[in-house]
């Protein structure tokens, strides 16, 4: 039912089509005429420029002093190897910077799966080829620095005045931290009752696998909303002083379970049990979770490990849960 002519229609999430684990189409309708392009372009720009991610920022290759050289027994030159290193899709858990190593010998391809790393690192595309070794005695050894960041940062932006102390052979890479591989939007016609001049926004997006497309849309919309809050009340543009109040609950307990980045199976099992927040989850016991349909011991172990990495555990008691801020949702 349409309201007053001055009322704005509020869009609703119509469909999320998961084409693949890294490719999704999100449809929103109805939108007032013109708002399809307004919101679509804003979200597209935020997705391209402001999504956090991880990338290789520095590399040292044994026997290589600069990028304009080659290495015996390696098919690619160093510049091509550096380009291939940029294509590694990596996730860091609980750290903002790590140093990884890679050593391989013998004929054949060298892939991202050959990188040695700890449990806090996940290589999402282990099949990604870095270079090819062309002889039985060929060998390559390198150390990679992976950092967390946002957007695109050229190597020149990380060069400082004290950079003369940087060892010869440590090569800096232009880093594309954004997990968004491709983003496009299309505005189609929509209809509500007798109105045919409305917009339908279709966002088509691919990621490198380190960030779920649905979560990327959610984060970009949150960033946009936070930036627009300043325009809601223009009378008070000063930043209010923050009162040092001890929060009733640890902020991590108020975050959705999606932030734990569990496997799809585990996440779906929790949602089926109406476990939407981390605070809901930590109050459950192991016995209670094992009674959840389709949630086995492997999923339980995964949940316990992820909680432990954040200093949490199952079976916790939370007084006055849920807080009013989420109880009304």
Curated annotation (Swiss-Prot):
EC number: 2.7.7.6
Notes on the domains: The N-terminal domain is essential for RNAP assembly and basal transcription, whereas the C-terminal domain is involved in interaction with transcriptional regulators and with upstream promoter elements.
Primary gene name: rpoA
Subunit structure, as described in the record: Homodimer. The RNAP catalytic core consists of 2 alpha, 1 beta, 1 beta' and 1 omega subunit. When a sigma factor is associated with the core the holoenzyme is formed, which can initiate transcription.
Function of the protein: DNA-dependent RNA polymerase catalyzes the transcription of DNA into RNA using the four ribonucleoside triphosphates as substrates.
Top-level EC class: transferase
One family name in Pfam for this protein: RNA_pol_L
Family matches, as NCBIfam families: PRK05182.1-2, PRK05182.2-5, rpoA
Alpha C-terminal domain (alpha-CTD): annotated span: 249-329
Organism, scientific name: Aeromonas hydrophila subsp. hydrophila (strain ATCC 7966 / DSM 30187 / BCRC 13018 / CCUG 14551 / JCM 1027 / KCTC 2358 / NCIMB 9240 / NCTC 8049)
GO cellular component, one term: DNA-directed RNA polymerase complex
Keyword terms of this UniProt record: DNA-directed RNA polymerase, Nucleotidyltransferase, Transcription, Transferase
SMART domains cross-referenced by the UniProt entry: RPOLD
Family of this protein: Belongs to the RNA polymerase alpha chain family.
Name the UniProt record assigns to this protein: DNA-directed RNA polymerase subunit alpha
Enzymatic reactions: RNA(n) + a ribonucleoside 5'-triphosphate = RNA(n+1) + diphosphate
GO biological process, one term: DNA-templated transcription
UniProt entry tagged with the keyword Protein biosynthesis: no
Cited CDD domains: RNAP_alpha_NTD
Organism classification: Bacteria, Pseudomonadati, Pseudomonadota, Gammaproteobacteria, Aeromonadales
């Amino acid at each position: 039912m349409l309201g007053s002519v001055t009322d704005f229609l509020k869009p609703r999430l119509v469909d999320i089509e998961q084409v693949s684990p890294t490719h999704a189409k999100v449809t929103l309708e109805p939108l007032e005429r013109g708002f399809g392009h307004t919101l679509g372009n804003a979200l597209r720009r935020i997705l391209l420029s402001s999504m956090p991610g991880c990338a290789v920022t520095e590399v040292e290759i044994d026997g290589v002093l600069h990028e304009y050289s080659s290495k015996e027994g390696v098919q690619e030159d160093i510049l091509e190897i550096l380009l291939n290193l940029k294509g590694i899709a990596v996730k860091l858990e609980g750290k903002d910077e790590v140093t990884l190593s890679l050593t391989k010998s013998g004929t054949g391809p060298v892939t991202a799966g050959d990188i040695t790393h700890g449990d806090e690192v996940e290589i999402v595309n282990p099949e990604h080829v870095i270079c090819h070794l062309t002889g039985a005695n060929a060998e390559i050894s390198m150390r990679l620095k992976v950092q967390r960041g946002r957007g695109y940062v050229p190597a020149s932006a990380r060069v400082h005045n004290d950079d003369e102390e940087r060892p010869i052979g440590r090569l800096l890479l232009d880093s594309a931290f954004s997990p968004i591989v491709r983003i496009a939007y299309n505005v189609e016609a929509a209809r509500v009752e007798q109105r045919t001049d409305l917009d339908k926004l279709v966002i088509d997006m691919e990621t490198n696998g380190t960030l779920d497309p649905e979560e990327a849309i959610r984060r970009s919309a949150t960033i946009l909303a936070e930036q627009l809050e300043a325009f809601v009340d223009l009378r008070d543009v000063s930043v209010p002083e923050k009162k040092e109040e001890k929060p009733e609950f640890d902020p991590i307990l108020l975050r959705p379970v999606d932030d734990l980045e569990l496997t799809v199976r585990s996440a779906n099992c929790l949602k089926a049990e109406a476990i939407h927040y981390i605070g809901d989850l930590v109050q459950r016991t192991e016995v209670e979770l094992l009674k959840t349909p389709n949630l086995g011991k492997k999923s339980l172990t995964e949940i316990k490990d992820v909680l432990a990495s954040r200093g949490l555990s199952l079976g916790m008691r939370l007084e006055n849960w849920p807080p009013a801020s989420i109880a009304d949702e």
